[in-house]
Amino acid sequence: METKRLAYVMFVLVCLFLAMAQPSQASYFSAWAGPGCNNHNARYSKCGCSNIGHNVHGGYEFVYQGQTAAAYNTDNCKGVAQTRFSSSVNQACSNFGWKSVFIQC
């Protein structure tokens, strides 16, 4: 009986810890419609591959928060990465041709 009680208390403590834990921030890639870093903005932050919208190639920014990324000239992150991000890039406000980005988590 004492073992079950201890297991229950441990379970409750773990649940409380998880409920109070803050989710960590992740790296993200933002792209603007342009011209430059103006107008509509799209943010890509999910792990894995994201296709960059065809209407947001006016400028970009990569915010590094522990996860690296790679940009591809093709949809669906096919082929060889053209650019790799391992640190932040603050608003590069000129057109770019990448069609997809892969965030490594």
Swiss-Prot record:
Annotated Gene Ontology cellular component terms: extracellular region
Gene Ontology annotations of biological process type: defense response; negative regulation of growth
Chief place of localization: secreted
Keyword entries, A-Z: Antimicrobial, Cell wall, Disulfide bond, Plant defense, Secreted, Signal
Disulfide bonds: C37-C93, C47-C105, C49-C77
Tissue: Detected at higher levels in needles and twigs from canker-resistant seedlings than in needles from canker-susceptible plants. During summer, detected on cankered, healthy and marginal bark. During winter, detected at lower levels in cankered bark and bark from the canker margin than in healthy bark (at protein level).
Subcellular localization, as worded in the UniProt entry: Secreted; Secreted, Cell wall
Gene3D superfamilies: 2.60.20.30
Induction: By wounding and by methyl jasmonate.
Keyword Metal-binding: no
The keyword Signal is annotated on this UniProt entry: yes
Signal peptide: 1-26
Chain's role: Antimicrobial peptide.
Name this polypeptide is given: Antimicrobial peptide 1
